Regions:
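Metal-dependent nuclease catalytic cores that hydrolyze phosphodiester bonds in DNA/RNA
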Residues: 1-114, 121-123, 127, 133, ...
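Generic signature of intrinsically disordered, low-complexity segments enriched in small/polar residues
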Residues: 8, 19, 30-34, 41, ...
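Mg2+/Mn2+-dependent nuclease catalytic core
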Residues: 83, 89-196
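Non-catalytic, well-ordered alpha-helical scaffold segments
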Residues: 38, 137-140, 214
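Metal-dependent nuclease catalytic regions and adjoining charged, substrate-binding loops involved
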Residues: 4, 145-248
Length: 248
């Protein structure tokens, strides 16, 4: 009998997705706002374009692409419902050297709310009881940059809306802007910029955040010799890419 799994449209789609995943996002001399809060060593490796030790496979790319489709669906709903006032606006901060795009700003009862849309499988959806540290830092960064403009200087409320992909249940967490959040955001970006300027590697903090899942081989793109964000891997990559590194 013909091997259905290895023939037909799946193979074509997976090959396409793998090729698309090889296209590295280039933020130039900026950090991605969506990486706020993540291990600074990982973010520096990303910006240097260090080759990952575990490139994404086709299944991961399918999940990633499906997430984008749900994301666009939610944006179309808020737009058609008439509550969205701005979507996919580009934000850029020349002092923090951060660039990014927010998902949605909607108007509810005469006040504005910044929304960021996420998707989750049924298992992770069930155990989420509060906003993750990474999402908090990401939203806080967006709020900080938006509030630099005259139009959104009074924007204080932001939310994460998570869509469960199996049954389309939703869950929301709220984050309000205050001086404490602002100080945390500025400290993070100023610190990573100092490491970058001084050409020093910060310690890997993947094990300290969100239960340490980013330190696992399946989630850490620079896991090598039993270590997440491996310095050994970085040194090996530098040795094999001398011309590229010296050209930085």
């Amino acid at each position: 009998m013909e091997d259905l799994y290895n023939t037909g449209v799946r193979v074509i789609i997976d090959n396409y997705l793998i090729e698309e995943s090889k296209k590295v996002r280039d933020y130039g001399n900026y950090w991605s706002a969506s990486s706020a809060g993540y291990c600074m060593r990982k973010n520096i490796f990303d910006r240097l374009k260090v080759e990952p030790t575990n490139p994404d496979d086709a299944r991961k790319q399918r999940v990633f692409t499906a997430g984008h489709l749900f994301h666009e669906w939610l944006q179309s709903l808020t737009k058609d419902a008439g509550c969205s006032v701005s979507q996919e606006g580009e934000l850029q901060d020349e002092k923090l050297m951060v660039i990014g795009h927010y998902d949605d700003i909607i108007k509810v009862d005469d006040h504005l709310i910044l929304y960021d849309y996420k998707t989750a499988n049924s298992r992770s959806f069930g155990y989420k009881k509060e906003m993750s540290y990474f999402h908090r830092m990401q939203l806080g960064t967006y709020l900080y940059m938006l509030r630099q403009s005259k139009e959104y200087k009074n924007l204080t409320e932001s939310r994460i809306l998570t869509l469960e992909k199996d049954t389309l249940r939703t869950k929301e967490f709220v984050l309000f802007y205050d001086e404490e959040l602002e100080a945390e955001i500025l400290e993070y970006w100023n610190t990573i910029n100092s490491f970058w300027t001084d050409k020093k590697l910060p310690p890997c903090t993947c094990e300290e955040q969100e239960g340490g899942f980013m330190s696992k081989p399946a989630y850490n793109p620079y896991f090598y010799n039993g270590q997440p964000c491996s310095r050994d891997w970085y040194e090996l990559w530098k040795e094999n890419n001398k011309e590229k590194v010296n050209g930085k």
